[in-house]
A protein has these predicted regions:
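Active-site hotspot residues in diverse enzymes, especially metal/ion-binding acidic/histidine motifs
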Residues: 2-273
Length: 273
């Protein structure tokens, strides 16, 4: 998967027209109540939206692939004087906050703006996500996040202290684990596929990469990890890929909004064997 993508940039580009129309409608209906800094216009007769700039997007994680997010926008407005004796107009800038939501399972095709208000302050999200749609987890939250993960996928570990079996965890998450050589040089020892695709794997018999159909929700672990590393490395790889599925699917789907051909996250070997 490529480097971190910006959700703010995506929203600003893809939903510019929707955001513009929402603010235009709000200012037209509420211009008498807007707290605008005007110097020449005394009584607002009309107001027209000239341009907008998305300043930041604050995202809150929701169940499944849904998200809700606040979009802070700086708008440039042209304001005209109501008194026809004065042919006055001036430009001013005002910030607005838009509450939005969408589902990444449908590529945000159901993008919705539920409200528009004048900006006052940044809202605190209960389950905040970064601009690349990765959950923001503070050190103090690690235990609660781990507990929630186990409650959803491995609840018996919370009832009686027990080691988490990676293969069982994967099955409980609806994932399939397959042992297969991935690259010739063992530069990648684990991969998880989020979407069906045709992918290349190293074939030792022919000593070349071969194209193979792969189903979504499949984890591949290179069996050389058993011999060149150890069983713990294999187990850690499986758990690592499970965590990708549980916590990073939204970041992955953001990447696909930019590049629809992306299908997997891979774990590379760092350093020597």
């Amino acid at each position: 998967m490529a480097g971190n993508r910006s959700f703010r940039d995506y929203v600003a580009d893809q939903f510019y027209n929707e955001i513009f129309a929402a603010i235009q409608g709000f200012t037209a209906d509420n211009y008498d109540d807007l707290d605008l800094r005007l110097y020449r216009v005394q009584n607002i007769g009309s107001i027209e939206l000239s341009d907008i700039e998305v300043k930041y997007v604050s995202v809150n994680d929701l169940p499944d692939m849904k998200i809700e997010f606040d979009v802070a926008v700086e708008a440039e407005l042209e304001v005209r004087e109501a008194d026809y004796h004065y042919d006055e107009s001036e430009f001013c800038k005002q910030w607005f906050m838009l509450k939005c939501s969408g589902d990444l399972n449908c590529n945000l095709d159901n993008f919705t703006i539920s409200s528009v208000t004048e900006y006052t302050s940044k809202n605190r999200q209960s389950r905040p996500m970064s601009d690349s749609l990765v959950p923001i987890i503070n050190k103090e939250q690690l235990e609660s996040v781990a507990t929630d993960f186990l409650r959803r996928y491995y609840p018996e570990a919370l009832i009686k202290p027990t080691a988490v079996e990676p293969q069982v965890l994967a099955e409980k998450m609806g994932l399939v684990v397959e042992m297969r050589e991935i690259t010739k040089d063992f530069s990648v020892f684990g991969q998880i596929y989020f979407h069906d695709c045709d992918a290349e794997f190293y074939d030792e018999d022919s000593d070349e990469m071969v194209l193979t159909h792969v189903d979504a929700r499949t984890i591949f672990v290179d069996p050389k990890a058993y011999f060149l590393r150890n069983l713990g490395s294999v187990n850690n790889t499986i758990v690592h890929e499970c965590v990708h599925w549980g916590l990073h699917r939204k970041a992955f789907e953001l990447e696909r909004l930019y590049n629809s051909s992306v299908t997997r996250i891979k774990c590379q070997v760092v350093g020597g064997i």
